[in-house]
């Protein structure tokens, strides 16, 4: 049995604007798949839990959500083996990387993966540019972060169960469909 923390990052929003928090429906389905396989799961939404905290970022932007210290306390208290970070949109990306950094600061052995629309679309952009000579090939920045071990692309409900089971049993993960990993800077492997 693994302890898995599924976490939604702080929200970068518009100062005095209408800033909405999206329900973590994707994380709920992933959590249920993991629970059905006897894993211990916690979902934590840092933006929702820290909704009253707004940090002025300048340029009419604010960061809404928990402080790094509060996030670190949640991670330490739950003591996960694996952390999954849901990055649905680009306005969550920077905070997602902050969470990954906090996790690895706590314990470098904790597996960290990211998933959601943002990483799936980053892969699509990367694949498009590879097949169109003359276009710049973008880096998949999520995987250029040393604190992120891999990414799940597409629907992760079943992929995540296979991934977690293989991680806790020290088995090869290289053939799991839907995994995206960095090979070297700017080169990625997608199953």
What are the roles of these predicted feature ranges?
Residues 33-34, 40-191:
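Glycine-rich beta-alpha loop elements in corrinoid/cobalamin-binding modules
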Residues 2:
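Nucleotide donor/acceptor-binding cores
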């Amino acid at each position: 049995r693994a302890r898995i923390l599924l976490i939604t990052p702080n929200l970068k929003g518009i100062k005095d604007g209408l800033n909405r928090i999206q329900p973590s429906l994707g994380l709920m389905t992933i959590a249920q798949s993991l629970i059905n396989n006897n894993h211990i799961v916690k979902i934590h939404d840092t933006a929702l839990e820290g909704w009253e905290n707004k940090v002025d970022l300048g340029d009419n932007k604010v960061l809404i959500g928990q402080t790094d210290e509060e996030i670190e306390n949640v991670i330490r208290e739950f003591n996960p083996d694996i952390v999954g970070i849901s990055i649905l949109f680009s306005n969550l990306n920077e905070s997602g990387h902050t969470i990954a950094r906090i996790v690895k600061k706590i314990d470098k052995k904790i597996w960290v993966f990211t998933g959601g629309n943002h990483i799936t679309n980053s892969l699509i952009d990367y694949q498009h540019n590879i097949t169109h000579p003359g276009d710049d090939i973008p880096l998949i920045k999520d995987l250029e972060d040393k604190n992120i071990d891999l990414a799940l692309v597409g629907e992760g409900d079943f992929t995540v169960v296979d991934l977690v089971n293989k991680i806790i049993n020290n088995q090869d993960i290289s053939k799991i469909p839907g995994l995206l990993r960095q090979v070297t800077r700017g080169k990625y492997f997608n199953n």
